Swiss-Prot record:
Binding-site list for shikimate: 13-15, 60, 85, 100, 211, 239
Catalytic activity: shikimate + NADP(+) = 3-dehydroshikimate + NADPH + H(+)
EC number(s) reported in the record: 1.1.1.25
Official protein name in the record: Shikimate dehydrogenase (NADP(+))
Record family assignment: Belongs to the shikimate dehydrogenase family.
Lineage: Bacteria, Bacillati, Bacillota, Bacilli, Bacillales
Length: 269
């Protein structure tokens, strides 16, 4: 079977490395390639995928919303989030999914016991935030809060959860057990601080969905304060694992997938 990831730029993607480690571990002769698709060529996406006989593909920046009109069907999670990161090509039809939210939550469950009782704050109100919130909503509905700088970003949110602005979140930071940053702060050299951690409780787990850099500014600051931290590596691995399940109905070797990514990030490959 043939798989791929589409985006622009895409040469930096670790998805091919991660998926090939999984294929090798499972003795599968599958392939996975990175396909650069500039925005001005996206109208040819059906032709590009068809000519390569792709059975399923991941979608990354900047095409997660752009892909939707080209789909024949879309699952409820992706529809709710308004973004697609996984496409199954089956019997000539394209079916869209979003595995980012479940990928993050599956990883979080493995390192945090008692998540059902945790008071959780999500920073940011973009697509990633909505995907994670949708999954956490199933587990911790009454204790889930999302904060954003501008409240208007919540206008298209249907989830009945606590929605506050960042200044309100800052003044009540000590009430939360887990804080999840989904904003671009700390990514690609961005050193802006998304929120002040002055009122952070000592037990609070501080998380970021970014995995490269391995530690974003908010994680570095939290670690310096003595707090446990959790980056986006597991989210990346688990969203890929969920994609693999959708494409093949097989269980992936998550350990092999994670180990190869860690080796690459450490410069060991």
């Amino acid at each position: 079977m043939k798989f791929a990831v589409i985006g622009n730029p895409i040469s930096h993607s670790l998805s091919p490395l991660m998926h090939h480690a999984n294929f090798q571990s499972l003795n599968l002769e599958n392939t996975y390639e990175a396909i650069n698709v500039p925005v001005n060529q996206f109208q040819d996406i059906k032709k590009i995928i068809s000519e390569k006989s792709i059975d399923g593909f991941n979608v990354t920046i900047p095409h997660k919303e752009r892909i939707i009109p080209y789909l024949d069907d879309i699952n409820e999670q992706a529809k709710s989030v308004g973004a697609v990161n996984t496409v199954l090509v089956k019997d000539g039809k394209w079916i869209g999914y979003n595995t980012d939210g479940i990928g993050y939550v599956n990883g979080l469950k493995q390192i945090y016991e008692g998540i059902e009782d945790a008071y959780i704050l999500i920073l940011g109100a973009g697509g990633a935030s909505k995907g994670i919130a949708n999954e956490l909503y199933k587990i911790v509905r009454p204790t889930l809060t999302v904060a954003n700088r501008t409240m208007s970003r919540f206008n298209n949110w249907s989830l009945n959860i606590n929605k506050i602005n960042l200044s309100h979140a800052e003044s009540h930071l000590d009430e939360f057990d887990i804080i999840i940053n989904t904003t671009p702060a700390g990514m690609n050299g961005n050193t802006d601080s998304v929120i002040s951690l002055n009122r952070l409780a000592s037990h609070t787990l501080v998380s970021d969905i970014v995995y490269n850099p391995y530690k974003t500014p908010i994680l570095i600051e939290a670690e310096q304060r003595g707090n446990p931290i959790y980056n986006g590596l597991d989210m990346f691995v688990h969203q890929g694992a969920e994609s693999f399940k959708i494409w093949t109905n097989l269980e992936p070797d998550i350990k092999a997938m994670k180990n190869i990514v860690i080796q690459k990030l450490k410069g060991e490959l």
